[in-house]
Regions:
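Bacterial N-terminal signal peptides
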Residues: 2-18
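Signature of exported/secreted
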Residues: 17-260
């Protein structure tokens, strides 16, 4: 039995966009991600399977005033993976120019990021880009705390995963990042995961939980200046191909930086 499409499990927080205020209209970002996935298929007559891979994505993000907030336009400049990446290199290459849209409300809270066209390449990399927008805002002060609850879907139809996440944020310290004053925000989150995915041995049901943490930097005007996160997921996959659910563990790490 094949491993799950690991792109759908890039669940850790990725890129935090600038909140409303004086942030630049257009910003370029680099996103580096690593993922290690292990599955025990012995109950289905298989073997223990492991995959580890990394990807690097470059994107251009544009913000425009819109009713009640700002519209978000994300254009993929490039996505590259190492030799173990489960998404084929031609698919990643064809994602160049793919466009995703989202929205920031007036408080700075982001809503869903979805492809403007359901082309194969855009849909397949949606999992890599699904966590672009954790909460950030201008005027953060040390000691500020807040929580956020989100539900995001990667993929479509019978090949999709829904992640429901509860996050707790705290503005922890004043620091310097990229020669700029910034507030370091720490984030802790828990998630529930449910979905389905076709496999060579029939449809599979996916469910489980994850837990993660990280920190990122926000300038006084709300601009995001980079960050890093890590997450561990404990999932189970079930279907007619196995007499009992098969356990899957996933460890993910994400780092984000701005490009000058």
């Amino acid at each position: 039995m094949a491993l799950l499409n690991a792109g759908y499990f890039t669940l850790a927080a990725g890129l935090v966009l600038p909140a409303l205020g004086l942030a630049p209209t257009t910003t370029k970002y680099r996103i580096d991600q690593t993922l290690t996935q292990e599955m025990d298929a012995t109950p289905a007559g298989g073997a223990k399977q492991r995959i580890a891979f990394s990807t690097t994505s470059f994107v251009t993000v544009s913000l425009a005033d819109s009713g009640g907030g700002k519209s978000i336009r994300v254009v993929v400049d490039s996505v590259k993976g190492d030799s173990a990446t489960p998404i084929p290199a031609p698919v990643l290459d064809s994602a160049r120019g793919a466009e995703f849209r989202g929205f920031l409300d007036k408080s700075g809270k982001p809503t869903g990021l979805t492809p403007t066209a359901h082309a194969g390449a855009a849909v397949q990399i949606q999992g890599l880009l699904s966590d672009f927008f954790p909460w950030a805002r201008a005027g953060l002060k040390v000691g500020d705390t807040w929580t956020d609850t989100t539900a995001k879907i990667s993929g479509t139809g019978s090949d999709s995963v829904t992640v429901r996440r509860v996050s707790a944020y705290k503005a922890a310290a004043n620091e310097t990042k990229e020669s700029r004053k910034a507030v370091r925000v720490v984030q802790d989150f828990t998630s529930s995961v449910q979905g389905t995915q076709p496999t060579p041995n029939g449809p599979a049901k996916i469910e489980g939980t994850s837990r993660g943490n990280g920190s990122y930097y926000v300038a006084p005007d709300g601009r995001y200046l980079g960050g890093a996160w890590q997450q561990q997921s404990a999932l189970k996959i079930s279907g007619s191909f196995a007499p009992q659910p098969l356990p899957i563990t996933i460890v993910q790490k994400t780092s984000v930086s701005t490009l000058k």
